[in-house]
């Protein structure tokens, strides 16, 4: 089947729209699907996504589409950008509509709720093993990417040609630098764990701790991410790159991060429900914390920061008590295999 679009993006939220804007601005005909017809109609009429990225115009090559069948027929390249808790549902709906030559890439960050499975496992359960899969990850705030500010990401996948094609498709000399990576597991894991550590950084700042504490959390958070990654077969070097250190620093230090702002609100005394309401959008790190904590316990991986964030979110522990417990842990060598 001949393509009528170079790529189809599933998910018309802030990040999906930002990636679609970047692709279309780079000369690629891009179809953007959203599950709410009224929202898609607004995109067409306003020529912008006022609900998520107000004031940023949509390029002429970006085509909003409310019909999933039409969107999936338009291109064999499918970029999924939906929250982790609906990822499986969206792909299950897409399965009978996919072309035989479809190739699936996602920018969804996180693990499957309840099970803690990697997104690749959710994808394979939903659509089978016959389609090439890939993931893109890295330090990206949707608003900056949509506005054309320089950004860098990494891509890894199951098929080298698909990865190469995605690099060519997404790379833009003016706005987006794309690195190929061969660590499919590592790129998926980095996007989940960084959300947990970002909540921890927000908690620390909300309590009133300073830059020293925040930096320590980021550094030791990177250790936790690397430790879990190696236990799952990822490469330690991956976490020194865009999907590890890059995403971690961005999410922990800038208030554009919903996860960081969520932690800030909790540190200042809000309860979980109020803090989520204040953000007004999905806080992936809330679910990710339980998933990462459960996964670490199952694998026997020590992740003390993750454990204390979990205790605050799900067991009602005060942020101050969580910080005290981290500080009072047994003294150990920084370079030992266990923290």
From Swiss-Prot:
It catalyses: sn-glycerol 3-phosphate + NAD(+) = dihydroxyacetone phosphate + NADH + H(+); sn-glycerol 3-phosphate + NADP(+) = dihydroxyacetone phosphate + NADPH + H(+). One of its GO terms (cellular component) is cytosol. InterPro entries: 6-PGluconate_DH-like_C_sf (IPR008927), 6PGD_dom2 (IPR013328), G3P_DH_NAD-dep (IPR006168), G3P_DH_NAD-dep_C (IPR006109), G3P_DH_NAD-dep_N (IPR011128), NAD(P)-bd_dom_sf (IPR036291). Keywords: Cytoplasm, Lipid biosynthesis, Lipid metabolism, NAD, NADP, Nucleotide-binding, Oxidoreductase, Phospholipid biosynthesis, Phospholipid metabolism. Its EC number is 1.1.1.94. Pfam families: NAD_Gly3P_dh_C (PF07479), NAD_Gly3P_dh_N (PF01210). Gene3D superfamilies: N-(1-d-carboxylethyl)-l-norvaline Dehydrogenase, domain 2 (1.10.1040.10), NAD(P)-binding Rossmann-like Domain (3.40.50.720). GO terms for biological process: carbohydrate metabolic process; glycerol-3-phosphate biosynthetic process; glycerol-3-phosphate catabolic process; glycerophospholipid biosynthetic process. GO terms for molecular function: glycerol-3-phosphate dehydrogenase [NAD(P)+] activity; NAD binding. Pathway: Membrane lipid metabolism; glycerophospholipid metabolism. It comes from the Bacteria. It is an enzyme of class 1 (oxidoreductase). The active site is at residue 194. NADPH binds at residues 14-15, 35, 109, 142, 258, 282, 284. Sn-glycerol 3-phosphate binds at residues 109, 138, 140, 194, 247, 257-259. It is found in: Cytoplasm. Coiled coil: none annotated. Belongs to the NAD-dependent glycerol-3-phosphate dehydrogenase family. NCBIfam families: PRK00094.1-1 (NF000939), PRK00094.1-2 (NF000940), PRK00094.1-4 (NF000942). Catalyzes the reduction of the glycolytic intermediate dihydroxyacetone phosphate (DHAP) to sn-glycerol 3-phosphate (G3P), the key precursor for phospholipid synthesis. This is Glycerol-3-phosphate dehydrogenase [NAD(P)+]. The gene is gpsA.
